[in-house]
């Protein structure tokens, strides 16, 4: 999923509505390829990579995108997609949303400003690896300049410290490459594997 978004960003495309509902499994089973859908809000950005339109699903939106709804002068970059990836990873690891929309606005805004660290408390997180928690926190970094890009996320130890998992993921991608779209599967340079 992160590699898919990395590919979009390499084409200067920001998805702007990454969420669980827009992810599909190619087939049943634990080892299925994830497919990204719903490009209705996707945007090709120009010089400087600046986006200014309030777009997306609020529960997954980065703070700088939410600010576009409140201020005329606010803008954001493709790193807003990285925030959404952090929300998705948080949900998959803990089974709950880091910044629930049903909270009063002031409480939700406070949680957003605090980022992920305070949201990763309790029993749900006690069994999650330090590397996974670190990646979630780095993706849910409030400051977009300090937030991980997709390239940086793919180089994170949570992805790179288990070569067998990486190799299985790369094999799955290669085995499931689509012959319909004519694109050749390309190995991400962040992954170093042996065939």
Q: What spans do the regions from the language model cover?
A:
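Conserved catalytic-loop aspartate of Hanks-type protein kinases
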Residues: 81
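Catalytic-loop of the protein kinase fold
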Residues: 9-26
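Hydrophobic anchor on a C-lobe helix of Hanks-type protein kinase catalytic domains
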Residues: 92-93
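Conserved activation segment of eukaryotic-like protein kinases, specifically the C-terminal portion
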Residues: 52-65
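Regulatory extensions flanking the kinase catalytic core
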Residues: 148-186
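C-terminal lobe of the eukaryotic/viral protein kinase catalytic domain
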Residues: 96-141
